[in-house]
Amino acid sequence: LEATVSRNKKYKFTMGNVVRSWKCTVENKSNKTLYADGSTPVSGSMATVLTDIAPGGTGVFLWEQSKGAARGAVGVVYYRYEDKILSLMASIPYDWHLYNAWANARVSNKKESFSNLYNGYDGAQQPTIAGNWGEVDGTKFFLTDKSHAEFNVIFSG
């Protein structure tokens, strides 16, 4: 990336090898199958295929920032069961000096937006800051506070 600061001076900036991602492990401790139902990207995207999770099973997926972007890894992933949707949100910042990592979950009749989960709108609980356990609607979750975050979800239904 080059920028011209004045007519005669050019400066070159590099973003280095900064990478943001979150790996999510979903443990299904219920007697219901969790059917993969897509995602809503805010920054970055799924780097792996989202798969169904059988009762007693575990699913894993990876969300990465967009290549070369000075942005974090942020989005919502959805699982459907019966007439409900499990929405899982994680937000891993690009700049740890300005922002924190956050996570949230919600079981509802619709796919929850990132805004609702991040801000605690429309009946969603307030998000949980990384490094703390959150619990909502029979779902426990924990997000580590590092650039390559681990998002652990235990769904009990």
Swiss-Prot record:
A motif (Cell attachment site) lies at residues 129-131. It is found in: Nematocyst; Secreted; Target cell membrane. InterPro entries: Actinoporin_PFT, Anemon_actinoporin-like, Cytolysin/lectin. The keyword Transferase does not apply. Gene3D superfamilies: Cytolysin/lectin. GO terms for biological process: cytolysis in another organism; monoatomic cation transport; pore complex assembly. Transmembrane segments: none annotated. Keywords: Cytolysis, Hemolysis, Membrane, Nematocyst, Secreted, Signal, Target cell membrane, Target membrane, Toxin, Transmembrane. It comes from the Eukaryota. GO terms for molecular function: channel activity; toxin activity. Pfam families: Anemone_cytotox. GO terms for cellular component: extracellular region; nematocyst; other organism cell membrane; pore complex. Disulfide bonds: none annotated. Residues 1-14 form the signal peptide. The keyword Transmembrane applies. Pore-forming protein that forms hydrophilic pores and causes cytolysis. Compared to equinatoxin-2 (AC P61914), it reveals lower cytolysis activity (5-12-fold difference, tested on erythrocytes), a larger pore size (probably 2-3 nm) and different affinity to membrane lipids (100-fold lower affinity to sphingomyelin). Binds to the two sphingolipids, lysophosphatidic acid (LPA) and sphingosine-1-phosphate (S1P). Does not bind (or only weakly) to sulfatides (SFT). Composed of a long N-terminal alpha-helix and a core region rich in beta-sheet structures. Before the pore formation, the alpha-helix binds the lipid membrane, partitions into the lipid-water interface and stabilizes the monomeric molecule on the membrane. Finally, it traverses the bilayer, thus forming the transmembrane pore. Octamer or nonamer in membranes. Monomer in the soluble state. In vitro, interacts with folate receptor alpha (of target organism). Belongs to the actinoporin family. HALT subfamily. PANTHER family: BRYOPORIN. This is Hydra actinoporin-like toxin 3.
